[in-house]
Amino acid sequence: MSILFFHFDGTGNEPSDAFSASNKDESITNVLKSHLLLGGSLHRFDGRLSPHSTHRSFYYSGIGTYGGVLSRYLNMGFAFENADVASILRQALLDFQCHYHPKIERVVLIGFSRGAALARRFAALIDPFVRSGSVIEAVMDTVASIGWPNLDKAERPTSEVVFENGISLPSCVGRALHLVALDEQRVAFRPTLMSHDKRIREVWLPGVHSDVGGGYRQDGMADLSFMVMVRWLGRQLVSILGQGRLLYRHVS
């Protein structure tokens, strides 16, 4: 039995954040931490976690981290549908098509901010190809301003993440965790919550947007959020991995 992990990072977030100048309050997010602690590589593109592992993990840096300087700024601000959004989803679908097979027991989708919106959209895209209930979502503080930077809640289209028939989870998703920032006041970071559904566990945690998803150099609060996610994932995957066993390395 195998698991495929797909990691969608937040807007402007990428591995080079780890090398930001000390005077910048920047670091990697919980999305990249998850990929790396699983054993994922930034250089091994088949997603294999080790030479003998049947599990695979794929990582996609955030919207606004592709192309030249102007392209990056425009995508960070507007997240055009036919630019980074399309490129990321296209690559994720290609990775899925190349590596999904009937022995895949679970598909795990992890995302933060706009990356969380991409993860939720990706679930709808793969819904026709996977077994009902076989997908697990673990997302952090979804911000679905895709298409335009909708700062007014009244103007934010629900179609950005909410899918067919007005529900926010396709049938392929068996369980979903949504970690939400309790203290975020910025209008641009209003979360796109999930619908009321027995498959969903929505947890509000102290802190602002990047305290939940990571990205600050001082990331103690984000580490707490990460542990909540890791433990929840462990419970969802116990039937595959065995009691008390996690794929994550050096996490206790």
What is each stretch, according to the model?
Residues 1-252:
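Active-site- or binding-pocket-proximal scaffold segments within functional domains
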